[in-house]
């Protein structure tokens, strides 16, 4: 659908929340996107120089268009761009930072932006803010688990146990040292998932009557620690798996 709407127009991809993602994976993604003919940039939506970082690839992406306009004697105008992304990736935070005032609602839950609006961004750009969009159906269930871990899907529409299990298995395979250090546990690559839950529950003191592990608290803890990047800088979509 988006490919049909965008057509042959220049496309800029902004990888937000780079401070919460694996730096090495971000670099791989930037290189991959460049090879695809896309103009990418990795940013932290709250950083002070955000406008320059976003403006640079946008100007580069539209350079040929404005050169043709100049040859025809057409006065240059502001670049108009539509901002499109999944919910809760920080689009509104970026827009407010660029505009230097609160023009878009923000929140750590999906679906905060409800309407479209044009935002002036410096002297070179005008940005159309749009509500977050998602696929109507996920062909691969793993996509939904990954999106849930970023907060793009509301918690009441997913199985949080499955989300936490996916997160722990991913970290067990790719970030074992960080997982052990953060929760002060001692697991290895062969540890069964239920034993990982038990280890975290014992370490954090999440117990119910009868000294039973409170798995619901462990589940919530793992999910929110992952979303807040407390365990480490994680990237769930690995460039090597493209």
Please report, for each region that a protein language model flagged, where it lies by residue.
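Helix-rich effector regions associated with P-loop NTPase G domains
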Residues: 1-12, 18, 39, 45, ...
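A structural signal for isolated positions on well-ordered beta-strands in alpha/beta enzyme cores
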Residues: 12-13, 82
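Canonical P-loop GTPase G-domain recognition
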Residues: 19-85, 204-207, 213, 217
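Conserved protein kinase catalytic core
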Residues: 22-23, 50, 102, 135-138
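Alpha-helical scaffold segments in soluble metabolic enzymes
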Residues: 53, 57, 93, 97, ...
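Short coil/loop residues immediately preceding or within conserved phosphate-binding loops
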Residues: 76-78, 101, 116
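Glycine-rich phosphate-binding P-loop
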Residues: 80-100, 130
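Conserved P-loop NTPase mechanochemical-coupling segment
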Residues: 95-106, 201
């Amino acid at each position: 659908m988006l490919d049909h709407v965008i057509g042959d127009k220049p496309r800029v991809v902004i990888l937000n929340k780079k401070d919460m993602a694996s730096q090495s994976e971000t670099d791989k993604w930037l290189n991959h996107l460049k090879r695809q003919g896309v103009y990418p940039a990795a940013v932290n939506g709250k950083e002070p120089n955000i406008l320059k970082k976003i403006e640079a690839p946008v100007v580069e992406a539209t350079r040929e268009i404005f050169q043709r306009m100049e040859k025809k004697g057409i006065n240059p105008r502001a670049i108009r761009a539509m901002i499109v992304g999944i919910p809760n990736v920080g689009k509104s935070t970026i827009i407010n930072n660029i505009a230097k005032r609160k023009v878009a609602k923000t929140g750590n839950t999906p679906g905060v932006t409800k309407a479209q609006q044009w935002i002036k961004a410096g002297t070179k750009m005008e940005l159309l803010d749009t509500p977050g969009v998602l696929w109507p159906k996920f062909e691969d269930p793993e996509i939904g688990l990954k999106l849930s871990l970023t907060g793009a899907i509301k918690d009441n529409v997913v199985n949080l146990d499955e989300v936490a299990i996916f997160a722990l298995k991913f970290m067990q395979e790719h970030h074992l040292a960080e997982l052990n250090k953060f929760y002060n546990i001692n697991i290895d690559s062969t540890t069964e998932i239920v034993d990982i839950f038990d280890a975290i529950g014992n370490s954090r003191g999440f117990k119910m009557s009868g000294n039973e592990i409170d798995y619901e608290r462990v589940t919530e803890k793992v999910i929110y620690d992952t979303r807040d990047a407390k365990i480490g800088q994680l990237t769930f979509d690995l460039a090597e798996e493209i």
